[in-house]
């Protein structure tokens, strides 16, 4: 049994194994608090994420279980990787991952990015997405703050708490508004990996321009801003709208023509604009895929088809439709954590699961 120590961070109790020291707050989200720490075993800096009250409701339990399963499954240079996980005696869950110094949001708010950095960051995002999508996973919440960067400009996609199966009947209100694909706003179902490509397009545009491309004040304003630049959605896209209220809203908007992106991004590389045009497309069926985007001429300095791997196997989503009580999710979580530590336990390492 691992030894646990307690520390107060922002009024929150961090109860972690003695393996981790020198805690310092990094950030807080809706579902958890993240601290940097020193791993005494490896002497490396790590990020420790505390999941707040993971067993308070079945919904939160399932969300945490999903994120844990994804972190265990996804192994790629451009995706954040899990290095440890444990449940404290207070039954909070802690994910330990590699620590990267900053994120794309902080970089974009501090200074304009030069062309070579934009290219390299975009390449790595798409390289990671190609792998994630090939595993049958849609991230659903890509935004600059979910893209971590270190001092060597290595980039990793993080925060898979909202990730879902590739499913033609997805539903729900997901993704930060500025980066949300129009098919989510228009239909709330029938969307797939292309929603992530739209988000990448918005992030790409923000790297080029230095500010968000579609900074909507609310759902309605967001869609209106999109149509000002990209024009009215084509009829075959409008026909896919399932909600009568949404359909009436879209039909009430003035007809608009798509504006050339060269007018919006006057100083950008023409090849960058050509690629952006293929990402910011209303019809997800014609939106470029991650693998094809990697082969675009704009990314030629970095593209290497022999080093852009896909997942070896699809992620197992069999649990995703389960409607289970908290106690069952808890047992499943314990099982996953014990499975993760199985190799370490065989080697005599401590396992952070309370008795």
From Swiss-Prot:
Annotated keywords: Activator, ATP-binding, Kinase, Magnesium, Nucleotide-binding, Serine/threonine-protein kinase, Transferase
Keyword Heme (UniProt): no
InterPro entries: Kinase-like_dom_sf, MAP_kinase, MAP_kinase_CS, MAPK_p38-like, MAPK_Sty1/Hog1, Prot_kinase_dom, Protein_kinase_ATP_BS, Ser/Thr_kinase_AS
Residues annotated as signal peptide: none
Residue positions of the active site: 141
Record field: catalytic activity: L-seryl-[protein] + ATP = O-phospho-L-seryl-[protein] + ADP + H(+); L-threonyl-[protein] + ATP = O-phospho-L-threonyl-[protein] + ADP + H(+)
Cofactor: Mg(2+)
Matches recorded under Gene3D superfamilies: Phosphorylase Kinase, domain 1 (3.30.200.20), Transferase(Phosphotransferase) domain 1 (1.10.510.10)
Family matches, as PROSITE patterns: MAPK (PS01351), PROTEIN_KINASE_ATP (PS00107), PROTEIN_KINASE_DOM (PS50011), PROTEIN_KINASE_ST (PS00108)
Binding site for ATP: 26-34, 49
The keyword Aminoacyl-tRNA synthetase is annotated on this UniProt entry: no
Top enzyme category: transferase
GO terms, molecular function: ATP binding; MAP kinase activity
S-S bonds: none
Annotated knockout phenotype: Reduces the expression of Msn2 and subsequent production of lamiocins.
Family membership: Belongs to the protein kinase superfamily. Ser/Thr protein kinase family. MAP kinase subfamily. HOG1 sub-subfamily.
Domain notes: The TXY motif contains the threonine and tyrosine residues whose phosphorylation activates the MAP kinases.
Protein name: Mitogen-activated protein kinase HOG1
């Amino acid at each position: 049994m691992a030894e646990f120590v307690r520390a107060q961070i922002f009024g929150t109790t961090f109860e972690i194994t003695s393996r981790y020291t020198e805690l310092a707050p990094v950030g807080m989200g809706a579902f958890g608090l993240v601290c940097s720490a020193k791993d005494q075993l490896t002497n490396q800096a790590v990020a420790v994420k505390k999941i707040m009250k993971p067993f308070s409701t079945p919904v939160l339990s399932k969300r945490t279980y999903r994120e844990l399963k994804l972190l265990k499954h996804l192994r790629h240079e451009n995706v954040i990787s899990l290095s440890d996980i444990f449940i404290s005696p207070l039954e909070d869950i802690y994910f330990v991952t590699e620590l990267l110094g900053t994120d794309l949001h902080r970089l974009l708010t501090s200074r304009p990015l030069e062309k070579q950095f934009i290219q390299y960051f975009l390449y790595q995002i798409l390289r990671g997405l190609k792998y994630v999508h090939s595993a049958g996973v849609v991230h659903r919440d890509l935004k600059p703050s979910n893209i971590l960067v270190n001092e060597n400009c290595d980039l990793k996609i993080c925060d898979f708490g909202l990730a879902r199966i590739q499913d033609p009947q997805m539903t729900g209100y997901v993704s930060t508004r500025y980066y949300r694909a129009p098919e989510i706003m228009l239909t709330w179902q029938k969307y797939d990996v292309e929603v992530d490509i739209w988000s990448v397009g918005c992030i790409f545009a923000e790297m080029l321009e230095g500010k968000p491309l579609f900074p909507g004040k609310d759902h309605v304003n967001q869609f209106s801003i999109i149509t000002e630049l990209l024009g009215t959605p084509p009829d075959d896209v409008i026909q896919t709208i399932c909600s009568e209220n949404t359909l009436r809203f879209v039909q009430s908007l003035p007809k608009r023509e798509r504006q050339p992106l060269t007018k919006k991004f006057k100083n950008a590389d023409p090849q960058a604009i050509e690629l952006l045009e293929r990402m910011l497309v209303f019809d997800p069926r014609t939106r470029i895929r991650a693998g094809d985007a990697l082969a675009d001429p704009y990314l030629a300095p970095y593209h290497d088809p022999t080093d852009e791997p896909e997942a070896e196997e699809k992620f197992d989503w069999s649990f995703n439709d389960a409607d289970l009580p908290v106690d069952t999710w808890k047992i499943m979580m314990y099982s996953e954590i014990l499975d993760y530590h199985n190799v370490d336990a065989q080697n005599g390492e401590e396992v952070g699961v309370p008795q």
